[in-house]
Amino acid sequence: MRKIALFIAMLLIPCMSFAGLLSSNSSTTPISKEYKQQLMGSPVYIQIFKEERTLDLFVKMGETYQLLDSYKICNYSGGLGPKQRQGDFKSPEGFYNVQRSQLKPDSRFYKAINIGFPNAYDRAHGYEGKYLMIHGACVSIGCYAMTDAGIDEIFQFVTGALVFGQPNVQVSIYPFRMTDANMARHKYSYYADFWKQLKPGYDYFEQTHKPPVVSIVDGRYVVNKPLSHEVVHPQLASNYTVPETK
């Protein structure tokens, strides 16, 4: 109740009109610091880019998602490519969902958000691992480590969104910004076929500023396709009932 009251108090701070925020911002320009608190509790969306060492946090404004801020990733491990097994020291790539049970405010790495690895895609391929997180302390063994100041703000907005009714926060993790030029640069990579499954999700958000709807069909990621009874959506396939975090 105290947490909910805090978010409500933040949202009631006198401020400029919401329409003004919409007209003065774009999906690629971070929102001014003085306006951030006005958006506390709004739905959010996360994109991570390994090669650029960047976490982008977006907030819903009207019908689309705008860039709240970009945060430098202190550290991740294992280079490009998806995590496949416990102990390979790699950080995951793919599409994940975070629910309230995956938040750890008292982590030994300051604060932590369990991304939900392995998801339905990972399990379909026999990938395994646990405790894969976005956390503070700038130390990583398969996780995405942020500065404490960075994870503080990310954690605050993710918590606020979930407290105010967002069922889960989507986290899209890419090896790099999936432009055509970057895809061509990596076309001979061992992981090229896997990355081609991720690119439609990246492209969809670039074009619409809305998170992609991601499903798994025959062990492959499929973006924005009509669902049938055979399709497993990652958020429905989560086997987390308690927070699996450090």
Identify the role of each PLM range.
Residues 1-4:
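Positively charged n-region of N-terminal signal peptides that target proteins for export
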Residues 6-11:
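Sec-dependent N-terminal signal peptides
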Residues 28-45, 57-58, 75-87, 91-100, ...:
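N-terminal post-signal-peptidase region of extra-cytosolic proteins
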Residues 61-76:
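Short Gly/aromatic-enriched secondary-structure transition segments
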Residues 87-244:
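Exported/periplasmic cell-wall-interacting domains
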